[in-house]
Regions:
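Hydrophobic alpha-helical segments within soluble ligand-binding/sensing domains
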Residues: 1-20, 127-144
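Membrane-proximal low-complexity regions enriched in glycine and acidic/polar residues
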Residues: 34, 39-42, 48-150
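Alpha-helical transmembrane signal-anchor helices
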Residues: 186-219
């Protein structure tokens, strides 16, 4: 199965929301999830953050929505995966996301590319084509006996992405430079790139040089 960067995404959320006390995670119930949940709970408990791990084998979709509607202050949601309900019926992702948006008043982070593009504030994600390449490599290793079918797919080529314009909904106003992330939907004029700064500086130097030259000519 794909092994997403939950730690990195939680850390991103904590940097953006340093007063966070609880993180609610939605994930599937594949093998290894119990160990993952235990590790995350132990790791972030030491940092004063409570991890609430919700999976479809313990909660129906309706129960999950009820849980996240009552999330405490100073918390955020991390959507990893929720593609089936308690009866193993496939859940349509966009329908579910619309319900989550209507239900959850807290910031949403994700490791899922579709969720990021649709509604999340930010996350550490790998593009879908990179997932495909990683899965292909794993299948090749399984077929050649190099690894076992239960081995997770390691996704190392990820991107930290935050949607600038979605901050307002949650009362945030972080600026480019405060986070080492790829910002999306930045309004023009908010951020000047290093190349633009270089052009401005060069232009200013040329103007000053011209003014100095004209002053010498007049004198």
């Amino acid at each position: 199965k794909l092994q997403y960067d939950l730690d990195g995404t939680i850390d991103m959320g904590l940097k953006m929301l340093p007063e966070t006390k609880s993180v609610y995670i939605l994930n599937d119930f594949s093998s290894g999830n119990a160990e993952l949940a235990s590790r995350l709970k132990h790791k972030y408990r030491d940092l004063g953050v409570n991890i609430v791990y919700l999976t479809p084998n313990k909660y129906s979709t309706a129960q999950m929505l009820s849980k996240i509607s009552a999330m405490p202050e100073k918390s955020f949601l991390l959507f990893a995966n929720w593609n089936r309900d308690e009866n193993q019926v496939v859940v349509r992702i966009h329908n579910l996301l619309n319900k989550i948006i209507d239900t959850c008043p807290k910031p949403i982070f994700t490791v899922n590319e579709k969720v990021l593009n649709y509604c999340a504030l930010g996350g550490v994600v790998a593009q879908s084509e990179r997932h495909g390449v990683a899965v292909g490599h794993l299948v090749e290793k399984i077929l050649t006996g190099v690894t076992s079918p239960s081995s997770p797919v390691q996704i190392s080529d990820t991107e930290k992405i935050v949607y600038f314009d979605r901050q307002r909904k949650y009362g945030l106003s972080l600026k480019p430079g405060q986070l080492e992330v790829q910002w999306r939907n930045i309004p023009k004029g908010i951020f000047i790139s290093p190349y633009e700064w270089a052009a401005i500086i060069i232009g200013a130097i040329m103007i000053l040089a011209l003014m100095a030259y004209l002053t010498l000519m007049w004198n």
